Amino acid sequence: MFSQKFAFSCSLSWLSFVLVCAVSAACFVPALEAQENPYIVAYDHNLEEPGSLEVEYFSTFGTQRGGPDFHGFWSEFEYGATAWWTTEFYLDAQSTFGESTIFTGFRWENRFRPLKTEHFVNPVLYVEFENVNEADKILKEVEGHDVESDYAVPNSVARKEKDREMEFKLILSRNYKGWNFTENTLAVKNLSNNPWEFGYALGASRPLTLKGAAHRCNFCLQHLIAGVEMYGGLGDRYSFGLHNTSHYVAPGLAWNLPSGWTFRIEPTFGLNDQSHQFLLRWGASYEFSGFGETVQNLFKGHRP
């Protein structure tokens, strides 16, 4: 039964990702060779190339001591609006084993880079509107007093409670001798009468080698980027700090193919009793360069 549920939820979550990639490929949009980092929670200062579209799928398999295991999954559609602005739309869903598979909501994210060139530290401003229900289990970030027991509420109960939030991040990132170092400070305000909540994420990553291969290849070491991230909650306005918060550390690996595909995997380990003991995250993405120009040309071609 477990394997059947898991296979069904994986098949469902992959469907939208595969369909979008197939439609986009049919439009003959060339792929852009890019080097994506392995982070799934933390952000660095790199934005999407202007006019490029990246379609992404991610999964989180989670274990729980107080409830059934779950599979949270989401699709992302990331577009480079300008050189300093990237916008992204999320669709979230989850399967809780022994209960149900449900759609949990959507998110609209925007990242703004105020400094055009590379600096010692590169800031990015992050703003997101989130409209999900309490059954959401993608764990895209940890905020406030989010703890493992929050995710044990049955889907039939949790899905009735709506969360509409504004999320803000200050991203400080630097590339140095092949390394990337990043720090994210998180502040979240529920649009109801709840206090501000806070969190953080830290990350460091580096390609396995900085030497480029003499020929095009898929398995060259420069296409593999290893890293680690750590993230957790910092309480809220009335009880700021580490008390009754959860924290995680996650080593990860990204494999960037010259064709435009990127694959990520990230085992995640809870650092205290309030955290999930183990999460397994993985994802795939495909980047289409010149997507905006292709769409414009399609519309121009239909003008009378």
List PLM regions with ranges.
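Transmembrane beta-barrel domains of Gram-negative outer membranes and organellar outer membranes
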Residues: 33-304
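Glycine-centered signal
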Residues: 1, 29-32
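Bacterial N-terminal signal peptides
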Residues: 11-27
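Charged interaction patches that mediate protein-protein contacts
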Residues: 1-3, 20, 60
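N-terminal secretory signal peptides that target proteins for export/translocation
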Residues: 1-12
